[in-house]
Swiss-Prot record:
Top-rank EC class of the record's enzyme: transferase
Keyword match Nucleotide-binding: yes
Protein name as catalogued: Nucleoside diphosphate kinase
Family: Belongs to the NDK family.
Keyword Metal-binding appears in the UniProt entry: yes
Residues of the active site: 116 (pros-phosphohistidine intermediate)
Cofactor(s) required, per the database record: Mg(2+)
Alphabetically ordered keywords of this record: ATP-binding, Cytoplasm, Kinase, Magnesium, Metal-binding, Nucleotide metabolism, Nucleotide-binding, Phosphoprotein, Transferase
Source species of the chain: Methanocaldococcus jannaschii (strain ATCC 43067 / DSM 2661 / JAL-1 / JCM 10045 / NBRC 100440) (Methanococcus jannaschii)
Amino acid sequence: MKERTFVALKPDAVKRKLIGKIIERFENKGFEIVAMKMIKLDREMAEKYYEEHKGKEFYERLINFMTSGRMIVMVVEGENAISVVRKMIGKTNPAEAEPGTIRGDFALTTPDNIIHASDSKESAEREIKLFFKEDEIFDK
């Protein structure tokens, strides 16, 4: 089933100049990038983005990290995009991520694990709407 998912390349990916290498993996897998932009999250937007983690012990560190530099946000489209992209990025903790996954190959620590991808259709819809207007998303 063709679907869209949200992907964010976190500040550490941008700082370490990994943008092209990561995007190339999605394109090599046959996915289309149908929307993409560079942003810098402010605290208010970061809190909206991570509202489900509010109150957790790692929340402040996560917010501080996500507002520390530029990010790339994008909408990736293709067959079973949500589940396939999640497999491609690997486990949240880079130490547990398989070699060959994006985190397994490039990430160093948590939350500095270079990438985020939506984990469900509902999350994808919420995150895409949070970062993109409809006219910023293109069909082929």
